[in-house]
């Protein structure tokens, strides 16, 4: 049985052209060196809320568990203080 040796270059090209290929996720907060997520930073918090108003899970965003808990608390505080809407039905 003969084996075909594949180049890494061809493998990368195939992965980029494949529509099912997904890049490795990383934690934005770890890279940035954030210690505490602030509930007043609405631009960052909006990135982690889906179109329907739900908090996006860590398995989709790549956020570490430590930061996901902080993110969850920060979003809930911002909602409680009326800085962010609870649902997608409210307009800013």
Curated annotation (Swiss-Prot):
Keyword annotations: Ribonucleoprotein, Ribosomal protein, RNA-binding, rRNA-binding
GO biological process, one term: translation
GO molecular function terms attached to this record: small ribosomal subunit rRNA binding; structural constituent of ribosome
InterPro entries assigned: Ribosomal_bS18, Ribosomal_bS18_CS, Ribosomal_bS18_sf
Name of a matching Pfam family: Ribosomal_S18
Cellular component, GO annotation: cytosolic small ribosomal subunit
Bridged cysteine pairs (disulfide): none
Keyword RNA-binding: yes
Subunit organization: Part of the 30S ribosomal subunit. Forms a tight heterodimer with protein bS6.
Family: Belongs to the bacterial ribosomal protein bS18 family.
Described function: Binds as a heterodimer with protein bS6 to the central domain of the 16S rRNA, where it helps stabilize the platform of the 30S subunit.
PANTHER family hit by this protein: 30S RIBOSOMAL PROTEIN S18, SMALL RIBOSOMAL SUBUNIT PROTEIN BS18M
Protein name: Small ribosomal subunit protein bS18A
Native organism: Cupriavidus pinatubonensis (strain JMP 134 / LMG 1197) (Cupriavidus necator (strain JMP 134))
């Amino acid at each position: 049985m003969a084996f075909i040796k594949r180049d890494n270059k061809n493998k990368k090209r195939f992965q980029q052209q494949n529509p099912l290929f997904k890049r490795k996720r990383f934690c934005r907060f770890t890279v940035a060196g954030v210690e505490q997520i602030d509930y007043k930073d609405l631009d960052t918090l909006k990135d982690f809320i889906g179109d329907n108003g739900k908090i996006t899970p860590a398995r989709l965003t790549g956020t570490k568990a430590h930061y996901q808990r902080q993110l969850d608390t920060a979003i809930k505080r911002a909602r409680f203080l009326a800085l962010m809407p609870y649902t997608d039905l409210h307009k800013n």
